[in-house]
A protein has these predicted regions:
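Short, glycine-/small- and polar/acidic-enriched structural segments
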Residues: 24-147, 154-157, 173, 179, ...
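Secondary-structure end/capping motifs
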Residues: 224-298
Length: 316
């Protein structure tokens, strides 16, 4: 009987550690992009209290993110909006907690003949992060202008680090970039100009002033089921940290440099352009519903074939 109890306790501890990590470490899978900045502030302030340590696992492509989710390498993740819907529709138990990044994407070019989407005909376009929000919106906008990939233009995909190096080296004339990388490239090479602001383009096609949802924080479903109060606390503290980031661009720049090796000055300059605005998942269903309907009508594969149901959203 004692052996059975000992075995049961060992299995329980192993299961608990597989979900929460040793010594109650909370892992957040995120790219070096706007959604990670509030997490840095949470680490700095020990936002979840003395019982929890927060650590970041960096992903640099949706493929790496998906592998991290499948392997349960973290409990919380920064998700591009199309990716979390795809994973959910494939049967993975994930929950969307919030949307925190809106817009943030631009078409930039150093080709003087490129002044609109239509001018990309016959040209090569570098796109950051295949299957991400920027990728989905890029193809949606180009399709609206009557341009099809391969037939009318060539798309080349790269992760964030790769595309920065390619563009900075002058090996690309046209690129889809996100902040803070756009600010960094424009500072390094004044020949590049912003041709299309994605939020303005989205508003043009929708006929209103709605923001364009780009990324949010999500959580493994089993974590939300096991400890909903922890997830609720994380969401609340993330919202506070995001507001601090917006109000303290210089300080978050220093923190991003210290923790992730990001350029402090570029972060400082780009914070106002990052589209940082916290909206809890329970309050964003209508906005995302409209987005999903548009993408479903355009290309169902972008969101995994169907509009996710209510169980995608964390409602605490």
């Amino acid at each position: 009987m004692k052996k059975f109890k000992s075995l049961f306790l060992s299995l329980f501890l192993m299961l608990n550690m597989s979900i929460f990590g040793a010594e109650k470490t909370i892992y957040v899978g995120a790219p070096k992009a706007p959604p990670v900045l509030p997490v840095l502030r949470m680490i700095e302030t020990n936002a979840l209290g003395k019982d929890y340590k927060i650590d970041i696992k960096v992903w640099d492509s949706p493929e790496v993110l998906i592998a991290m989710v499948q392997g349960k390498e973290a409990q919380f993740f920064s998700f591009p909006i199309p990716v979390i819907s795809k994973l959910y529709n494939k049967g993975l138990n994930v929950k969307l907690m919030n949307i925190n990044t809106w817009g943030v994407t631009s078409l930039i070019s150093k080709d003087p003949t490129v002044k609109s989407w239509r001018d990309l005909k016959g040209k090569t376009l570098y796109i950051v992060l295949k299957s991400s929000s920027p990728d989905a919106y890029t193809h949606y906008f180009l399709d609206k202008e009557g341009l099809k990939e391969k037939r009318d233009y060539n798309a080349v995909y790269a992760n964030k680090a790769e595309i920065i190096n390619i563009v900075a080296a002058g090996k690309a004339d046209n690129a889809i970039m996100i902040e803070p990388d756009t600010t960094a490239i424009l500072a390094k090479n004044p020949n590049f100009k912003i041709i299309v602001n994605f939020e303005e383009e989205w508003q043009k096609y929708k006929g209103d002033k709605s923001a364009i949802p780009t990324a949010g924080i999500g959580v493994l479903g089993e974590v939300a089921e096991k400890d909903p109060e922890l997830v609720k606390k994380f969401n609340e503290e993330y919202a506070k940290a995001l507001q601090w980031v917006k109000e303290n661009p210089e300080e978050i720049g220093k923190l991003a440099k210290e923790k992730l090796g990001m350029d402090a000055e570029i972060i400082k300059k780009s914070v106002p352009k990052m589209g940082l605005n916290f909206v809890a998942a329970k309050d964003v269903k209508k906005i995302l519903g409209e987005y999903y309907k548009i993408m479903l009508g355009y290309d169902p594969k972008i969101i995994g074939g169907k509009i996710p149901d209510e169980n995608l959203y964390f409602n605490k």
